[in-house]
């Protein structure tokens, strides 16, 4: 499951909305929405994320958080190590091999380390 899919499911459950009802409201098939929730589809489009935000009447901060989760929800992320050091390339490969076997506490610790070492920059608003 992707971060976006997990949050989408939480939002839907909190409002007592069925998968079919939300799919109809978003004008997508229930199969597509289920695949999105389970991480079997790619990153949702900005338009779909916007529709979800409207369907759940999310406030600005929650809508931004959902959009951020969508950007972090590529089910098959790729990392091009061309131009990186041998150490960085080795780390990327080792991480790819190890990640599926890491316990949740270790994943959380790595996420904290990355967030501390490279804080996310706020997105600039267009328009």
Where in this protein do the model-derived segments appear?
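Conserved hydrophobic/aromatic packing and binding residues within compact polymer-binding modules
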Residues: 8, 22-23, 33-36
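Alpha-helical residues within the helix-turn-helix
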Residues: 13, 24, 54
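Recognition helix of helix-turn-helix/homeodomain-like DNA-binding domains
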Residues: 27-43, 51
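DNA major-groove recognition helix of helix-turn-helix/homeodomain DNA-binding modules
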Residues: 47-65, 71-72
């Amino acid at each position: 499951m992707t971060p976006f899919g997990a949050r989408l499911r939480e939002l839907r459950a909190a409002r007592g909305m069925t998968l079919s009802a939300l799919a109809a409201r978003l004008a997508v098939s229930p199969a597509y929405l289920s695949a999105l929730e389970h991480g079997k589809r790619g990153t949702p489009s900005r338009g779909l994320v916007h529709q979800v935000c409207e369907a759940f009447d999310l406030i600005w901060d929650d809508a931004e958080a959902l959009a951020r989760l969508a950007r972090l929800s590529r089910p098959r992320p790729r990392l091009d190590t061309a131009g990186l050091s041998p150490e960085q390339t080795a780390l990327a490969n080792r991480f790819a091999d190890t990640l599926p076997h890491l316990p949740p506490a270790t994943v959380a610790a790595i996420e904290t380390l990355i967030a501390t070492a490279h804080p996310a920059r706020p997105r600039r608003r267009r328009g």
